[in-house]
């Protein structure tokens, strides 16, 4: 029931209510025996010049910990018995509800074509889920991304007839591979991505089992943060052995920061959460270039500008000069789904035996093309555009105005057109045959097409996944955690007393 501040019922308003009864979910005790994730995200080149975002999704990843993983979690209680799950404050608002998606689509530039593409993607993910609840190949990370994709559409276990069981199996997979004692989830990038998914899942379901897993996962993430504000691979808290300096990796920091923000909005508890959020702002500032842009492990102006800029927006620092300059650097960016075709063709010409020590086909192809590629084409001079544009699309959305409308005008039709579709491939909850759709860049990364499908679908749900960080609805929090807010500005983070 909606009440006004202080407890008084809002006058002269008709409030439509619905009695929610607990819905029994099938017994989930018989879960297939867990197999250790067999493949993890590979390393790719990251640090690149401006307008040529080529990114690494991961690097060397550790095996699963020696300690025993947590036992099978207790079966989910029907989440419909829990207080309304759509409580995420600030940028999340209540825009993922079925009744508000249409309004948000019209308000921010989405339409029937984008929503149809999203539904095809969700059905493709459902169809391609493995029996243990995961997605290949980097099973933990891809499962985290898939969960975030379903949640962005407002799909929840216990409520979504068509996708509820899919999400439930995915969440149970993450909880099953998590170390019961330490909270560690196997993998490198996998841990912060999975933590992000668990935190957001708790915020939307209030399920106590998910809460336990999310809070445990937060612990190694927060403890792995450097005094300088950043993170490095595997959340290693120690400085580099050779230089004695802390390696603050903007790409890795991006997933850590998103996980912290999701934890904050879900009101999860960790005594170090507030400080970690404030300190993370300093970490991104450390990697900001004086004239704008964010680098890999230090100041730079490359594709990671979108990562640093979005994270500063999400962490309440969009009015900081580093964030504003990052947006200026991105003014010349043009959205595109596809990898740069000539780069791929050039790589195909290079034989492995022709490579010298420390050379890769990618580095050689880049070097060759640098002599001929005109500057205006270098935006597409990348194998992993979706990694950068996942962040860039959100940056533009939060920036709003003509910046967003101009971006969306190009992004929306390009992404819808780029989706591959199989007709009548799966039945929906009503038994009707429906199409499935996916996205896949033309390179050889092992996590295609799951990663591309999730990142592209998330961009096509930006219209209702978030409220712009500059909107009045987004900035007025019920409980102000980091600092005070106003009706017109982002929540400000005080970074001066750490």
Where do the model's predicted regions map?
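Active-site-adjacent helical/loop segments in soluble small-molecule enzymes
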Residues: 418
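An alpha-helical repeat/solenoid feature that recognizes helix-turn-helix modules
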Residues: 80-120, 134-166, 179-219, 223-278, ...
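Intrinsic-disorder/low-complexity signature in envelope-associated proteins
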Residues: 2-119, 123, 127-128, 481-495
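Active-site-surrounding "flap" and adjacent substrate/cofactor-binding loops of secreted or lumenal enzymes
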Residues: 164, 168-174
